[in-house]
From Swiss-Prot:
Organism listed in the record: Helicobacter acinonychis (strain Sheeba)
The keyword Iron is assigned to this record: yes
Protein name (record): Ferrochelatase
First-level EC class: lyase
Compartments where located: Cytoplasm
Reported function: Catalyzes the ferrous insertion into protoporphyrin IX.
InterPro entries given in the database record: Ferrochelatase, Ferrochelatase_AS, Ferrochelatase_C, Ferrochelatase_N
Annotated catalysed reactions: heme b + 2 H(+) = protoporphyrin IX + Fe(2+)
Pfam family, one: Ferrochelatase
Pathway: Porphyrin-containing compound metabolism; protoheme biosynthesis; protoheme from protoporphyrin-IX: step 1/1
Lineage of producing organism: Bacteria, Pseudomonadati, Campylobacterota, Epsilonproteobacteria, Campylobacterales
Top-level taxon of origin: Bacteria
Name of the gene this protein is made from: hemH
Amino acid sequence: MNLAQENLNSPNNLGNNATKSPKETVILLNMGGPNSLYEVGVFLKNMFDDPFILTIKNNFMRKMVGKMIVNSRIEKSKKIYEKLGGKSPLTPITFALTERLNELDPSRFYTYAMRYTPPYASMVLQDLALKEVESLVFFSMYPQYSSTTTLSSFNDAFNALKSLETFRPKVRVIERFYASEKLNEIILNTILSTLNNHKSQDFVLIFSVHGLPKSIIDAGDTYQQECEHHVDLLKDLMRQKNIHFKQVLLSYQSKLGPMKWLEPSTEGLIEKHRKSNIIIYPLAFTIDNSETLYELEIQYRLMAARLAIKEYLVCPCLNDSIEFAKFIIELVKNLKDE
């Protein structure tokens, strides 16, 4: 399958810009996900060839190790995406979010670029270079900063922009936003909505985030610190609103390989609190993906059933909700020149 065919599988609203004349474009940056079962291999290959993910300095060794990881995971990953309808939900949900953003804020154009699957930043920026765009906002869709996510996406986007010699717009960035009280109110409302008529004090609330090898944190990545700070801010907000859970905990999911990863694991906390009702919020994601809809919603739900946990609830991500869209617009409007 060639690049043009790949692009057909990944919706993007760049064409809509032809009927608009905003001078600023906001590009939502995320990791991407397979838009078909064919793209599972593309997704894994690109991810494990990323030096921010697989931090092996020797390019040859990184590619060799990456190829081994891809070969060991591709069939398992395809089965996961088969259960999700043959593709990741991340791209279509992001497309829906940009459509909503363009409706709510016609003064700017909102689009998106993915790190490991189409539409890549290079493709999006090539298109924008043909239009009279004067300024860009690179918007990281990760609430907390990490070299493995935020920095990787920014590095990719800036390298793609640098390669376009005649396109030199002003560029501003939003690299983290977890400390926003407005965001945390939206998160808390999502948790309460998921609880429905259940009492919060009857539940252990687990904020599950994507795990990282401890070596990356030891090298100076601030991700763990920011996740812990984020949970503290949410605890403060819950106290202010007199909302109480049995416990509020932070955990790390999606461990890969034999190396030491951040702890406690989400699986470990579910087992530890098997005698309690559990509600999980995916704190490091803004758009649902395989780690939320498969790992949390399917895999760990089966685990909870085996452990005879009475109530196991999983909150959705913010996705294309109007509240999240308005929050993004507010962040962009308040962004100071750098």
